[in-house]
Amino acid sequence: MISTPEPLHAGHILTPFCCGVDSIDNWLEQRAMKNQTTGASRTFVCCGSDSNVLAYYSLASSAVTTNTSPGRFRRNMPDPIPVVVLGRLAVDKSLHGQGVARALVRDAGLRVIQVAETIGIRGMLVHALSDEAREFYQRVGFVPSPMDPMMLMVTLGDLVESV
């Protein structure tokens, strides 16, 4: 059984999390709690019954220039465009192929929609680390940047429609 996403705290066990990508595994262990404490990003984790992290994602605020954004994303927007960055998203190898990543994107989308009721946000942005990740994000509604196909975005309106 896996828990619903909750904010990372000191009681969570970060090792032996292994998604198969060293940089993402290492970020969870070495940076996630520091960023949580300083406010640089917020990490949300799903755990097993023993508080071991089995999946996670992080969110941070940012902005993108209009020339790096797809047409619908930049239409009628200031430069730069306010966004939330889906900074990391990973699922332990033991849960690959079970829809957990898609559920994490949905949860992140719901949080972004909630935040957008308080502050101005155009949508969510992600930097895919591989072609496989890029294809996944495109399947869940993200559109690639015209300047960088590994940077993908989804508008707030599309998030609302998809969740």
UniProtKB/Swiss-Prot annotation:
Keyword annotations of the record: Acyltransferase, Repressor, RNA-binding, Toxin-antitoxin system, Transcription, Transcription regulation, Transferase, tRNA-binding
Reaction(s) this enzyme catalyzes, per UniProt: glycyl-tRNA(Gly) + acetyl-CoA = N-acetylglycyl-tRNA(Gly) + CoA + H(+)
Knockout mutant characteristics: Deleting the operon causes 90% reduction in persister cell formation in mouse bone marrow-derived macrophages. All 3 tacA-tacT operons can be deleted without an effect on growth in cell culture.
Top-level lineage group: Bacteria
GO molecular function, one term: tRNA binding
Active site positions: Y137
EC number: 2.3.1.-
pH relationship of activity: Optimum pH is 7.5, has much less activity at pH 6.0-7.0.
Pfam families, per database record: Acetyltransf_7
Top enzyme class: transferase
Protein residues bound to acetyl-CoA: L89, V91, H96, G97, Q98, G99, A101, R102, E132, R139
Up-regulation conditions: The tacA2-tacT2 operon is up-regulated about 15-fold in a relA-spoT-dependent manner within 30 minutes of phagocytosis by mouse bone marrow-derived macrophages.
InterPro entries linked: Acyl_CoA_acyltransferase (IPR016181), GNAT_dom (IPR000182)
The protein's assembly and partners: Homodimer (in absence of antitoxin). Forms a complex with cognate antitoxin TacA2. Forms a 4:2 antitoxin:toxin complex with cognate antitoxin TacA2.
Function: Toxic component of a type II toxin-antitoxin (TA) system. Acetylates tRNA and inhibits translation. Acetylates exclusively Gly in situ. Overexpression during the lag phase of a tacA2-tacT2 deletion strain leads to very small increase in persister cells in the presence of cefotaxime but no detectable growth phenotype in absence of antibiotics. Compared to a protein with a single amino acid change (TacT2 from S.enterica NCTC 13349, Glu-29 is Lys in NCTC 13349) this protein binds tRNA very poorly and acetylates tRNA very poorly. Persister cell formation is neutralized by cognate antitoxin TacA2.
Family, as annotated: Belongs to the acetyltransferase family. GNAT subfamily.
Protein name: tRNA-acetylating toxin 2
Species whose genome carries this gene: Salmonella typhimurium (strain 14028s / SGSC 2262)
